[in-house]
Curated annotation (Swiss-Prot):
The gene is MAP1A. Ubiquitous. Zn(2+) 1 binds at C15, C18, C42, C46. It comes from Arabidopsis thaliana. Its main location: cytoplasm. InterPro entries: Creatinase/aminopeptidase-like (IPR036005), Pept_M24 (IPR000994), Pept_M24_MAP (IPR001714), Pept_M24A_MAP1 (IPR002467), Zfn-C6H2 (IPR031615). Its EC number is 3.4.11.18. Keywords: Acetylation, Aminopeptidase, Cytoplasm, Hydrolase, Metal-binding, Protease, Zinc, Zinc-finger. This is Methionine aminopeptidase 1A. Belongs to the peptidase M24A family. Methionine aminopeptidase type 1 subfamily. One of its GO terms (molecular function) is metalloaminopeptidase activity. Zn(2+) 3 binds at D231, D242, E369.
Length: 398
């Protein structure tokens, strides 16, 4: 609604719609510091009648502001990511963006100290052992020694994710979240597994609003009302621990809150059936049933996975119904469950950076993930929340 302005300040101005003497000014134009000539109106009725076309002035001004900010960043060495992290460009790639978000420039790759043990992709971006391992086809039964290493690694990964959660608020960039993840991982003696994995340029994934997964931390500042998923994987003592959570940024609308809550419940319900003898394909049935009951959809392009000394290996864990996942759970197996749930349809597209998966319809998406160990009697959540974990979900009690 237009606000009344000091009469003397607009006495010489005309209505932007009908050219009658102006008495009101658009408050959004005032906030954006736009010229008063295009912000002035004679009456509320005239302002409302002009709104459908007038609001485009705000969008253009905001895009121009973003362009100016990004130009400053590019002059400081920040560039847009393309070709799955193998190249950079100073120009925003052309793309039919599905929602309000667009790519932002990213900072240079963060450095890992020489003394930190590194996976085989750390230097040249190419995993050597993982794609050729027999464990891409056979689900490994972990030894007690491997399980103990995984417990240690997953606890570190949880502590790193909690550190990231504590800095999330409006105005923080996802690049800053990545810095926190990187430094916390290094401080614990670990390596951030995503860094340079098939050339992924950052130490964690940050997926905002319509981004489903694999969002690259960048210069965009989180805004009040956003939701953001932070996905952390730590490599420590030769094995990996993987988890993620979706967080609220400031005051989030009820539909987004329900999306996040339902996604959390999907993961919890899936974990509840994990025990020896259960077929992997049953996980998708459980997740899909709960999501669709809430009018939501399950992403089909990305799945949970085996994990241990390898970042990704068998089994494959689809989250949708009527999937063809093979195999039965056995004690000693470790894998992730990580449902991605969309407010709209399940289909996705990938940004020009080659990594960022977004909803095809531009609607929001949420995700939660844990690394799990199948025990003789059920399941151990290796990445479970700690007593010290931030209290960020109103439906949880410590």
């Amino acid at each position: 609604m237009a606000s009344e302005s000091d009469a003397s300040s607009i006495a010489t101005l005309s209505c932007a719609r009908c050219e009658k003497p102006a008495h009101l000014q658009c408050p959004k134009c005032i906030d954006l510091k736009l010229p008063r000539e295009q912000a002035s109106f004679c009456t509320q009725e005239c302002f409302k009648a002009a709104w459908s076309s007038h609001k485009s002035v705000h969008v253009k001004a905001q895009l121009s502001s973003i362009g100016d900010q990004n130009s400053d960043l590019i002059s400081q060495g920040w560039l847009y990511c393309v070709k799955k992290g193998q190249a950079r460009t100073p120009k925003l790639p052309h793309f039919d963006w599905t929602g309000p978000l667009k790519q932002y420039p990213i900072s240079t790759k963060r450095v890992v100290p020489a003394e930190i043990e590194k996976p085989d992709w750390a230097i040249d971006g190419t995993p050597k052992v993982e794609p050729n391992s027999d464990l891409q086809h056979v689900v490994e039964i972990k030894t007690p020694e491997q399980i103990q290493r995984m417990r240690e690694t997953c606890k570190i990964a949880r502590e790193v994710l909690d550190a990231a959660a504590r800095v999330i608020h409006p105005g923080v960039t996802t690049d800053e979240i990545d810095r926190v993840v990187h430094e916390a991982t290094i401080a614990a003696g670990g390596y951030p597994s995503p860094l340079n994995y098939y050339f992924f340029p950052k130490s964690c994934c940050t997926s905002v609003n319509e981004v489903i997964c694999h969002g690259i931390p960048d210069a965009r500042k989180l805004e009040d009302g956003d939701i953001v998923n932070v996905d952390v994987t730590v490599c420590y003592k030769g094995c990996h621990g993987d988890l993620n959570e979706t967080y609220f940024v400031g005051n989030v609308d009820e539909a987004s809150r329900q999306l996040v809550k339902c996604t959390y419940e999907c993961l919890e319900k899936a974990i509840a059936i994990v025990k020896p003898g259960v077929r992997f394909r049953e996980i998708g049935e459980i997740v899909n049933r709960h999501a669709t009951m809430s009018g939501l959809s399950v992403v089909r392009s990305y799945c949970g996975h085996g994990i241990g000394d390898l970042f990704h290996c068998a089994p494959n864990i689809p989250h949708y119904a009527r999937n063809k996942a093979v195999g039965v759970m056995k004690a000693g197996q470790t894998f992730t469950i990580e449902p991605m749930i969309n407010a709209g349809g399940w289909r996705d597209r990938t940004w020009p950076d080659g990594w960022t998966a977004v909803t095809a319809d531009g609607k929001r998406s949420a995700q939660f993930e844990h690394t799990l160990l199948v025990t003789e009697t059920g399941v151990e959540v290796l990445t479970a929340r700690l007593p010290s974990s931030p209290d960020v979900y109103p439906w949880l009690t410590k």
